[in-house]
Amino acid sequence: MLWIMAVLPLVLAGPELNVRMQGTDSIFEGLELKRSVRETDNNCSEGLYQVGPFCCQPCQPGERKVKDCTTSGGAPTCHPCTEGEEYTDRKHYSDKCRRCAFCDEGHGLEVETNCTRTQNTKCRCKENFYCNASLCDHCYHCTSCGLEDILEPCTRTSNTKCKKQSSNYKLLWLLILPGLAILFVFIYKRYRKRQPGDPESGIPSPESVPMNVSDVNLNKYIWRTAEKMKICDAKKFARQHKIPESKIDEIEHNSPQDAAEQKIQLLQCWYQSHGKTGACQALIQGLRKANRCDIAEEIQAMVWEDHENSISNSRNENEGQSLE
């Protein structure tokens, strides 16, 4: 009787025990299958990349891939990046080089290290500018302490630290500021009286520019205008003259790291859409509306000077011919 009770649990557990063992066998088979798939997924050694049946070496820094290798372990056909325009700074499998960064002077930046085929441009803040962020795409003017003492001078990575004024200095400034305000108003009124168009200024107003000057070819002045504008000024000018937003985005996409090229392309796009007739006058008026009167007056002065020189040269030639 005792042996029947001992054997009965084993008989009842038999099917369940068999199922568990079969399940365990299936798990082991699945693991083996995964291991086999993993081994066939990557047949190349570290540092190589697979192209069909071949494991190819990468291109070296300063190069881009032109054609994959044709033998396992072989090197692809690689061409050098354009010096001063493109770079790659590590081994890679790409068919493109990276575009060199542009240090925008309008944002207070200057070149620290020129771009090479193996190294990107390194920018830094110009003198009297600073940036205290880890990645800087815009530098700020250093603070001037004025009559205060300087505790720490401005560096390229930190702003000036000034010593706080005493109450006596504050009282002095309260006495000086009204006088400075009066002086500013006086100078401003004098300046307004000598705006272009005033006979004493020697510079005609945009409305009084003769037709032959108004229709001057602006191509030689486009880059000078762009050089003095910030990228935000150029975009504002383009939008004021109905340049489509899609065209502005296209220009930015074509030269993503080159703000100088973007400014030139924006102005050239406007010039092409406007046409030569009246373009000089439209450019000067547009710059004034964009609150860049300084650029407008400088461009107008250059155009007027070139016009006067052209007239003078023509007179000299005519006089020389009459003497002959």
Swiss-Prot record:
Name of this protein: Tumor necrosis factor receptor superfamily member 6
Range of residues in the leader sequence: 1-21
Record's subcellular location: Cell membrane; Membrane raft
Claim: Signal is one of the keywords in the record: yes
Entry annotated with the keyword Acetylation: no
Major localisation: membrane
Species of origin: Rattus norvegicus
Each TNFR-Cys repeat, start to end: 43-79, 80-123, 124-163
Function: Receptor for TNFSF6/FASLG. The adapter molecule FADD recruits caspase CASP8 to the activated receptor. The resulting death-inducing signaling complex (DISC) performs CASP8 proteolytic activation which initiates the subsequent cascade of caspases (aspartate-specific cysteine proteases) mediating apoptosis. FAS-mediated apoptosis may have a role in the induction of peripheral tolerance, in the antigen-stimulated suicide of mature T-cells, or both.
Disulfide bonds: C44-C55, C56-C69, C59-C78, C81-C97, C100-C115, C103-C123, C125-C139, C142-C154, C145-C162
Residue numbers bearing the Phosphoserine modification: S214
Chain segments carrying region Interaction with HIPK3: 201-306
A matching Pfam family: Death
High-level lineage: Eukaryota, Metazoa, Chordata, Craniata, Vertebrata
GO molecular function terms attached to this record: calmodulin binding; identical protein binding; kinase binding; protease binding; protein-containing complex binding; transmembrane signaling receptor activity; tumor necrosis factor receptor activity
Intervals, Cytoplasmic compartment: 189-324
Gene: Fas
Gene Ontology CC annotations of this record: apical dendrite; apical plasma membrane; CD95 death-inducing signaling complex; cell surface; death-inducing signaling complex; external side of plasma membrane; extracellular region; extracellular space
Glycosylation sites: N43, N114, N132
Parts of the chain that traverse the membrane: 172-188
Mod. after translation: Palmitoylated. Palmitoylation by ZDHHC7 prevents the lysosomal degradation of FAS regulating its expression at the plasma membrane.
Residue span, Death domain: 219-303
Domain notes: Contains a death domain involved in the binding of FADD, and maybe to other cytosolic adapter proteins.
SMART domains: DEATH, TNFR
Intervals, Extracellular compartment: 22-171
Biological-process GO terms, alphabetical: activation-induced cell death of T cells; apoptotic process; apoptotic signaling pathway; B cell mediated immunity; cellular response to amino acid starvation; cellular response to cobalt ion; cellular response to cytokine stimulus; cellular response to estrogen stimulus
Mode of membrane association: Single-pass type I membrane protein
